[in-house]
Amino acid sequence: MIDSANRADVFLRKPAPVAPELQHEVEQFYYWEAKLLNDRRFEEWFALLAEDIHYFMPIRTTRIMRDSRLEYSGSREYAHFDDDATMMKGRLRKITSDVSWSENPASRTRHLVSNVMIVGAEAEGEYEISSAFIVYRNRLERQLDIFAGERRDTLRRNTSEAGFEIVNRTILIDQSTILANNLSFFF
């Protein structure tokens, strides 16, 4: 039960061809975003988020085939993240402070983004994007976490140097049981 039915439907269809220039721009935006996260340049990364951001990571459960549509929690149910700009600012303050025990010492991350598909356009200058990701995180000496999944984003074109802002991000993680000590980083 991911988000609203209409938004989820666009991600299930084969995307129409897009201009190679747009595809390249979107991919470069995601590579830049990954670099900012990997380099812990969180304030610069935060500038890529729209003021009306919705950052959502539903909980995944293992279901039998007939209940597979209920595999992910919905927007009015429990979630790992269900954040707006205010919540994201709080997370940013925490992750960059010296008092956050979950990130002091800091995690070392590597964000890999691939399979970037522009699957639709909501409005003029807004694009629905599906991408696959792997986030590798190493913390302390022996703590190692690997997360894989799909991100479903709405990007809005803007006049910033990056060219886009993230309006909506839904993170569909492949794991149903998260073995990591915390989720104190960004996807």
UniProtKB/Swiss-Prot annotation:
EC number from the UniProt entry: 1.14.12.3, 1.14.12.11
Keyword NAD assigned: yes
SUPFAM superfamilies, per the entry: NTF2-like
Pathway(s) where this gene product acts: Aromatic compound metabolism; benzene degradation; catechol from benzene: step 1/2; Xenobiotic degradation; toluene degradation; Xenobiotic degradation; xylene degradation
Pfam families in the record: Ring_hydroxyl_B (PF00866)
Gene Ontology terms for molecular function: benzene 1,2-dioxygenase activity; toluene dioxygenase activity
Reaction equation(s) it catalyzes: benzene + NADH + O2 + H(+) = cis-1,2-dihydrobenzene-1,2-diol + NAD(+); toluene + NADH + O2 + H(+) = (1S,2R)-3-methylcyclohexa-3,5-diene-1,2-diol + NAD(+)
Cofactor(s) required for function per UniProt: [2Fe-2S] cluster; Fe cation
Signal peptide: none
Keywords: Aromatic hydrocarbons catabolism, Dioxygenase, NAD, Oxidoreductase
Cofactor note text: Binds 1 [2Fe-2S] cluster per subunit. Binds 1 Fe cation per subunit.
Entry-linked InterPro entries: NTF2-like_dom_sf, Rng_hydr_dOase-bsu
Gene Ontology BP annotations: 3-phenylpropionate catabolic process; toluene catabolic process; xylene catabolic process
Source superkingdom: Bacteria
PANTHER family: 3-PHENYLPROPIONATE_CINNAMIC ACID DIOXYGENASE SUBUNIT BETA, BLR3401 PROTEIN
Protein purpose: Catalyzes both the oxidation of benzene and toluene. The beta subunit may be responsible for the substrate specificity of the enzyme.
Record family assignment: Belongs to the bacterial ring-hydroxylating dioxygenase beta subunit family.
Protein name: Benzene 1,2-dioxygenase subunit beta
Biological source species: Pseudomonas putida (strain ATCC 700007 / DSM 6899 / JCM 31910 / BCRC 17059 / LMG 24140 / F1)
Lineage: Bacteria, Pseudomonadati, Pseudomonadota, Gammaproteobacteria, Pseudomonadales
